[in-house]
């Protein structure tokens, strides 16, 4: 269980999260997993209209599904549009996702969204160090996504030369978060 001190969005379910990767964080996956109490972070490519329609047609998914955005202006516009369309009373979780969370803009966006939408549970990542975990929490993130480049299908390590062993990252980030 996750009890959020900042909003009424307390999560009670299976502590497994389907990633917002292409082919994983889909509407179909969210519908199927929500029946089992499993959380889904949707992919960032859905439009505001698609998201509004999905959550209108599937209110049960509001309990354990996060809208995902990046840090581009179009992503922020998408978030504002979804919140403005009356869906604001149902959107509880937001995943702010970048492949490598080590930029000043990333922490700034987390802080701006926290100030604008205090009721949201913000999931932010991806990071692999205690310092950035701490920065995101101080900026307003409730949950920090940990991991850069450890997966077998992840291309971040190959394309950017940035990666970190997953267990080491979890240990370091969990220590900083506590």
What is each stretch, according to the model?
Residues 1-178:
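Active-site entrance/lid segments in N-terminal catalytic domains of soluble metabolic enzymes
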